[in-house]
């Protein structure tokens, strides 16, 4: 009977063949493998209908390509914020929905969720993995939690205090260059170029206790870091190069690998030498003596770190964290400082008020140097920094891919597995949160005006359990560099308005050019 029933298919006796059954089982598994994500997308698309969305380009591309890394892209984000006010749905192709969020109340349940519930989305950051390894930026789960606990003491104010001297020294070197370049009265300078070298100079001294003199002469290591940042940003813009197989066959891919090797070799050599020194000079007691003398660098702190079970970090872990700090600490601070100087150049009345505040603080002090305790004595300068970070946040967005449904304040739900794109730029430019958001107004951060405002309205360093661990380091460096710069130079805007360019960090197309005029000793 079975033979008869299958004969219409032309199978005859072969219908009972175990090979055919195996083939059918394999086909069923393949079909399930294909259909399951499609069903998931279909189910999510139904659940996401409660989120409005702008018009798509077409059903294949979705919204892909509507936001470019350009001035126009940022203006488009501002139009989304004005239209949707809190959140909208965004389709990357036909299968990948993203919820873009730009209001503090809707950001809150995502960023304040436990780190294991709201891990960082790694779609973009995976390009950094060969360079940064499993450092805090890239790691997830238990490894991230363990490293975060172990690294938190590295950013205690007792560790950071001695770094202020480094910030002063590196800023002084930069200013000596500016004085030479402005010997005829003034000079037009690309702020990103000069300040990036200054922040890298500081970081090398704070992380490795190494002075490469990179502000005065070329450094292979510094050149490699700058090149890696450029290559990652460029790769992100070219979809075909997202495929590793293609990328590493290109000239850019080969340059990326070469620069990675150079950076890793430098960090590995420092770690090996430091461990050898520890063995020769008495091990952990040497580090404890350095800690007492307040001369620990970041590598020392990592070598001292132990988890709750007494287990130390491996050399590979130390390299990943050191490389991550070098990456995360130079570009963001350079972007922040460059845009702060731009905003003060456009508002000379605020620039002059900051200058007077610094002069009053350093009155009759020789040498003119900012100390740790001074950082809390510059309230207006701090307000100007914060307002610039609001208007021009170095990192314009962060992403989370939640492992469970996230319920928003109005009852809408972001389904598990859907990426949440938290627009720092959009939140900072949201007129429902910040009146006249395009106006540079430092008094927004006056103590009276801060009252009643959500702490998530201002998130240049992210927020929640995965916020920036080095934000105090960054703010301290910006305060020192800005205070000394305004004490010694008048900063004037270029005739041409810069076009913003969001990449890994917020840059300006062709650089951010400003005019600097040295102030006479009497004027200082």
UniProtKB/Swiss-Prot annotation:
One of its GO terms (cellular component) is endoplasmic reticulum membrane. Keywords: Endoplasmic reticulum, Heme, Iron, Lipid metabolism, Membrane, Metal-binding, Microsome, Monooxygenase, Oxidoreductase, Transmembrane, Transmembrane helix. Heme binds at residue 468. Gene3D superfamilies: Cytochrome P450. The keyword Chloroplast does not apply. The keyword Heme applies. Disulfide bonds: none annotated. Induction: Up-regulated in bone marrow-derived dendritic cells by bacterial lipopolysaccharide (LPS), a ligand for toll-like receptor 4 (TLR4), and by poly(I:C), a ligand for TLR3. It is a single-pass membrane protein. InterPro entries: Cyt_P450 (IPR001128), Cyt_P450_CS (IPR017972), Cyt_P450_E_grp-I (IPR002401), Cyt_P450_sf (IPR036396), Cytochrome_P450_Monoox (IPR050196). Highest level in polymorphonuclear leukocytes and dendritic cells. Detectable in lymph nodes, spleen, bone marrow and peripheral blood. Highly expressed in ovary. Very low level in liver, kidney, and smooth muscle. Expressed in neutrophils (at protein level). The chain crosses the membrane at residues 19-39. Disruption phenotype: Mice are born at the expected Mendelian rate. No visible phenotype. Its cofactor is heme. A cytochrome P450 monooxygenase involved in the metabolism of the pro-inflammatory lipid mediator leukotriene B4 (LTB4). Hydroxylates at the omega-1 and omega-2 positions LTB4. This oxidation step leads to LTB4 inactivation, which is postulated to be a crucial part of the resolution of inflammation. Mechanistically, uses molecular oxygen inserting one oxygen atom into a substrate, and reducing the second into a water molecule, with two electrons provided by NADPH via cytochrome P450 reductase (CPR; NADPH-ferrihemoprotein reductase). This is Cytochrome P450 4F3. The gene is Cyp4f3.
């Amino acid at each position: 009977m079975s033979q008869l029933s299958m004969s219409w298919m032309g199978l005859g006796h072969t219908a009972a063949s175990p090979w055919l059954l195996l083939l059918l089982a394999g086909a069923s598994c393949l079909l399930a493998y294909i259909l399951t994500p499609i069903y998931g997308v279909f189910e999510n698309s139904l659940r996401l209908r409660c989120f409005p969305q702008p018009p798509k380009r077409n059903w294949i591309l979705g919204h892909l390509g509507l936001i470019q890394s350009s001035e126009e892209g940022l203006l488009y984000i501002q139009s989304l914020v004005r239209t949707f006010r809190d959140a909208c749905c965004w389709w990357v192709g036909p299968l990948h929905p993203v919820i873009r969020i730009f209001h503090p109340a809707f950001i809150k349940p995502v960023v304040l969720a436990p780190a294991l519930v709201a891990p960082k989305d790694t779609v973009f950051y995976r390009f950094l993995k060969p360079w940064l390894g499993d450092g805090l930026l890239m790691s997830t789960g238990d490894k991230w939690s363990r490293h975060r606990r172990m690294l938190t003491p590295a950013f205690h104010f007792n560790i950071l205090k001695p770094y202020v001297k480094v910030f002063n020294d590196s800023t002084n070197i930069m200013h000596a260059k500016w004085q030479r370049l402005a010997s005829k009265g003034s000079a037009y300078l690309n702020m990103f170029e000069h300040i990036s070298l200054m922040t890298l100079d500081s970081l090398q001294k704070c992380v490795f206790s190494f002075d490469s003199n990179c502000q005065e002469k070329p450094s292979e290591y510094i050149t490699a870091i700058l090149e890696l940042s450029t290559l990652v940003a460029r790769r992100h813009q070219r979809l075909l190069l997202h495929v590793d197989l293609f990328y590493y066959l290109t000239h850019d891919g080969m340059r990326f690998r070469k620069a990675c090797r150079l950076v890793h070799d430098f960090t590995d050599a420092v770690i090996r030498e430091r461990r050898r020194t520890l063995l020769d000079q008495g091990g952990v007691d040497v580090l404890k003596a350095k800690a007492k003398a307040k001369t620990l660098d970041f590598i020392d702190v990592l070598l001292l770190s132990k988890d709750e079970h007494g287990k130390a970090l491996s050399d590979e872990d130390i390299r990943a964290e050191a490389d991550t700090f070098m990456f995360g600490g130079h570009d963001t601070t350079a972007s922040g400082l460059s845009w702060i100087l731009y905003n003060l150049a456009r508002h000379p009345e605020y620039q002059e008020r900051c200058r007077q505040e610094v002069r009053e603080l350093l009155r009759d002090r020789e040498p003119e140097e900012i100390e740790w305790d001074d950082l809390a004595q510059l309230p207006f300068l701090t307000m100007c920094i914060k307002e610039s970070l609001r208007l021009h946040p170095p990192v314009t967005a962060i992403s989370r891919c939640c492992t469970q449904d996230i319920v928003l304040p109005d009852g809408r739900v972001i389904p598990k597995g859907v990426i949440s794109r938290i627009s720092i730029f959009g939140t900072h430019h949201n007129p429902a949160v910040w009146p006249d958001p395009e106006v540079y107004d430092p008094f927004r951060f006056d103590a009276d005006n801060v009252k009643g405002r959500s702490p998530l309205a201002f998130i240049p360093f992210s927020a929640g359990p995965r916020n920036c661990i080095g934000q105090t380091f960054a703010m301290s460096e910006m305060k020192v560099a800005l205070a000394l710069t305004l004490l010694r130079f008048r900063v004037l805007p270029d005739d041409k308005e810069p076009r913003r360019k969001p990449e890994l960090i917020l840059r300006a197309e062709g650089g951010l050019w400003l005019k600097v005029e040295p102030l006479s000793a009497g004027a200082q």
